[in-house]
C-alpha cells in the first residue's frame, strides 16, 4: 500500500530532474498535423485554450476521461470513453485495528470490487463504487454510494459501519467501450494512446 499523492509527487520530481517541463492548466483544444519533412522534425502542433502552441514529434494521449476527445482531434474515432464514478469513504483512525491487509472480494466485470484498504496513515478506506455515468465532472458523494459500500463492507467486517466515516471522496475513471485499456500506437504516426 502506498500513498497515491506522495507517489505522484515523487514521480513528477524525478521527471522534472530529467528535463520534463510541466504545463499546468493548459486545455488542449486542437492538434494540427505538420507536413512531412518539417525542419524541426515536428509531426504535430498541439494548441491550448490559452494560445500556447507546442510543436512535437510525439503526442502521448493520457487525457483519461477526455482521451477520446483528444484522439478525435487527429481524426481517430476508434473508441468512446464513458465516466465510471467511484466513491470511497475514510474511517476514523480508531478503526485501524480491523485489518493490516487489503480485504477484497471477487472482482466484477466492471470493477475490482469494494475493498477494505489500510492506508499509509493507519486509517481504513472503504470502496470504491463503480457506477457508469454520462457526467464527466460529477465528483459528489451520494447517500446511495455510501449505502452501497457499507452494506457490502459490513458483510466482510461486521465492526465497520458508516458512523465511523471522517471523510468521503469521489473520482471518475475512464471506461472505454472496448472493454480494455487503450494503450499503444495509432494510425496517426507519432500519436500514441496511453
At which residue positions do the language-model features occur?
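General beta-strand structural signal in soluble alpha/beta enzymes
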Residues: 22-24, 61, 126, 167
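Flavin (primarily FAD) binding-site architecture
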Residues: 61-76
Amino acid at each position: 500500500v502506498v500513498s497515491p499523492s506522495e507517489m505522484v509527487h515523487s514521480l513528477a520530481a524525478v521527471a522534472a530532474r530529467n528535463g520534463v517541463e510541466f504545463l499546468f492548466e493548459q486545455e488542449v483544444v486542437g492538434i494540427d498535423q505538420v507536413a512531412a519533412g518539417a525542419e524541426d522534425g515536428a509531426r504535430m502542433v498541439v494548441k491550448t485554450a490559452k494560445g500556447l502552441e507546442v510543436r512535437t514529434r510525439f503526442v502521448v494521449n493520457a487525457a483519461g476521461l477526455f482521451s477520446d476527445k483528444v484522439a478525435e482531434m487527429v481524426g481517430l474515432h476508434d473508441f468512446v470513453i464513458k465516466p465510471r464514478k467511484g466513491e470511497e469513504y475514510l474511517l476514523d483512525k480508531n478503526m485501524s485495528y480491523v485489518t493490516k491487509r487489503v480485504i477484497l472480494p471477487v472482482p466484477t466485470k466492471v470493477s475490482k470490487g469494494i475493498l477494505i484498504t489500510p492506508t499509509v496513515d493507519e486509517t481504513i478506506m472503504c470502496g470504491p463504487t463503480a457506477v457508469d455515468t454520462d457526467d464527466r465532472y460529477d465528483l459528489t458523494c451520494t447517500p446511495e454510494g455510501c449505502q452501497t459500500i457499507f452494506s457490502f463492507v459490513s458483510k466482510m467486517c461486521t465492526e465497520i459501519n458508516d458512523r465511523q466515516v471522517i471523510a468521503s471522496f469521489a473520482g471518475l475513471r475512464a471506461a472505454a467501450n472496448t472493454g480494455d485499456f487503450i494503450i499503444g500506437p495509432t494510425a496517426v504516426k507519432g500519436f500514441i494512446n496511453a
